[in-house]
């Protein structure tokens, strides 16, 4: 009888441990495969750009699709683009919100509303493509394929 109780306890512990491991794996896999998470990382890098420009640039550039990098690169040119009109309006943004407007198996489009550091309010369209990860060619991840220039609203906040 005592052996049976220990066996049941052992099986419960093994089952619980396997569930936790599965949930952790699933969560981390989802983190890598959700375009919303990538977009949040990128926008948070824009939000804190001045506090660590090199890290922010590495994050933003790291999630750029190879086609995007070909057009906007090399990285030094990409940085110059970020620091000049109209894209510098996104740097050090105060707040943002986004809505997914298009969703396909390999492409997601977001409408992003941004409150800039100067209190102007604008939106951009951000387009991701699910493609081969630059850091790990055996995996696919969401990469920025395009970002529109800011479209300003009539009045700020």
Model-derived segments and their meaning:
Residues 1-5:
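Positively charged n-region of N-terminal signal peptides that target proteins for export
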Residues 14, 19, 82, 132-134:
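Prokaryotic Sec-type signal peptides and long signal-anchor helices
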Residues 50, 70-71, 153-156:
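Short, solvent-exposed loop/turn elements at domain surfaces
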Residues 15, 43-47, 82-86:
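Generic secondary-structure transition motif, activating predominantly at the C-termini of alpha-helices
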Residues 53-105:
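Short solvent-exposed beta->alpha transition segments
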Residues 20-56:
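Short, low-complexity N-terminal intrinsically disordered segments enriched in polar/charged residues
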Residues 6-15:
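Sec-dependent N-terminal signal peptides
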Residues 101-157:
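Exposed beta-sheet edge and beta->alpha loop/turn motif
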